[in-house]
Amino acid sequence: MLREMLGCCKVYISEARNKTALEAIERALKPFPPAAIVNKFEDAAYGRVGYTVVSSLANGSSSSLKNAVFAMVKTALDTINLELHCGSHPRLGVVDHICFHPLSQTSIEQVSSVANSLAMDIGSILRVPTYLYGAAEKEQCTLDSIRRKLGYFKANREGHEWAGGFDLEMVPLKPDAGPQEVSKAKGVVAVGACGWVSNYNVPVMSNDLKAVRRIARKTSERGGGLASVQTMALVHGEGVIEVACNLLNPSQVGGDEVQGLIERLGREEGLLVGKGYYTDYTPDQIVERYMDLLNNS
């Protein structure tokens, strides 16, 4: 039964260089078994780390997952100052994005309930403007739409980087939880629930951001490309720009299809395209890793 009643939460934090802060965030989860971190993906160029947290939701108990993630969020807000942060990946806050996914036989309603409860606590206790999206929000609004309204995709520093604290003293979009006043040092948080999303990034060996943006645009559903694919072109170190892809329906459109299209578009632009990579495991691999962690603990 345990194997069939698991919830997954991905927590994206705007930091990758401050090891002391990251270690504190990881320690914060430990008092809440059976919650466990099954994957950590750090990217120094982006100034971003993604944690994949899994816990049992059996017998109606979701407190372990919620409490573990809340502790990680609180520690991140206590140890990281957005005003000192810079990176080539957009962000709206210290804790930029939290997404819950059902694993195995767990329902989207179960993880949506956890997401909603967590968001209310972040807003009311930590006093950070918090936005709900996907199945956790009554209108089913998308993460993309919230980000666009809050200016997520507009870099604010030369070199196509995002740097410093949140630009506004008041958020222009009323949050689902928390105040409209926003701390420059903390920013805002988006919390949602949805089916599985895979992140697949493809490096293009170029400094021509306009050309890679054309490739990214033509790859995305929004630009007439692949269904259920969202993309951004992001500088990723010297001489490399990545087409960062969200695969919203990876069972239908996966990394191989994305890779093939970007390679073809790259040839049309006269650019060399490298082999892409996933930033996380598949749901089945995550369940397997979690069960191994439990059995070996």
UniProtKB/Swiss-Prot annotation:
Domain of life of the native organism: Eukaryota
UniProt similarity note: Belongs to the formiminotransferase family.
Tissue/organ expression: Expressed constitutively in roots, stems, leaves and flowers.
Function: Involved in the regulation of root growth. May regulate sorting and/or transportation of trans-Golgi network (TGN) vesicles in root cap peripheral cells, thus influencing the extracellular secretion of mucilage components in the root cap.
A molecular-function term among this protein's GO annotations: folic acid binding
The UniProt record lists the keyword Transferase: yes
Name recorded for this polypeptide: Formiminotransferase cyclodeaminase-like protein
Region named Formiminotransferase N-subdomain: 2-196
Keywords: Golgi apparatus, Transferase
InterPro entries registered for this protein in UniProt: Formiminotransferase_C, Formiminotransferase_C_sf, Formiminotransferase_N, Formiminotransferase_N_sf, FormiminoTrfase_cat_dom_sf, FTCD
